Amino acid sequence: MARIAGVDIPRDKRIEVALTYIYGIGSTRAKTILTKAGVNPDIRVKDLEDNDVQKLRNATESFTIEGDLRRQEGMALKRLQDIGCLRGRRHRMSLPVRGQRTRTNARTRRGARKTVAGKKK
């Protein structure tokens, strides 16, 4: 099993698809990496040679992926919360950030319903 950027990529998949298992690499970026490394996108991971894997490792080093990317995204959210902007406050309150309605929808973001006692007559 090939290990790139700390991730074991699946052996039986085409390398073009297998690279997308790495956080921060989608299909477009996978094609870019394969072109840069000079590796055939139709080859299976199990058929890769050691020098091909090393070329792929070198090609992925120029991109922000995995832990570094997760850290960057976390810092961006923390920055929004620290400066107190609307987006940061919405993130902190676990509400939709991009202007969606919350009176009836947004169940995923708000969580399960909280039962409120009814009004006595």
From Swiss-Prot:
Region (Disordered): 97-121
Keywords from the named record: Ribonucleoprotein, Ribosomal protein, RNA-binding, rRNA-binding, tRNA-binding
Gene Ontology, cellular component aspect: cytosol; small ribosomal subunit
Ranges of Basic residues composition bias in the record: 100-121
SUPFAM superfamilies: S13-like H2TH domain
Listed GO biological process terms: translation
Function: Located at the top of the head of the 30S subunit, it contacts several helices of the 16S rRNA. In the 70S ribosome it contacts the 23S rRNA (bridge B1a) and protein L5 of the 50S subunit (bridge B1b), connecting the 2 subunits; these bridges are implicated in subunit movement. Contacts the tRNAs in the A and P-sites.
HAMAP family: Ribosomal_uS13
Subunit structure: Part of the 30S ribosomal subunit. Forms a loose heterodimer with protein S19. Forms two bridges to the 50S subunit in the 70S ribosome.
Descriptive protein name: Small ribosomal subunit protein uS13
UniProt organism field: Synechococcus sp. (strain CC9311)
Lineage, highest ranks first: Bacteria, Bacillati, Cyanobacteriota, Cyanophyceae, Synechococcales
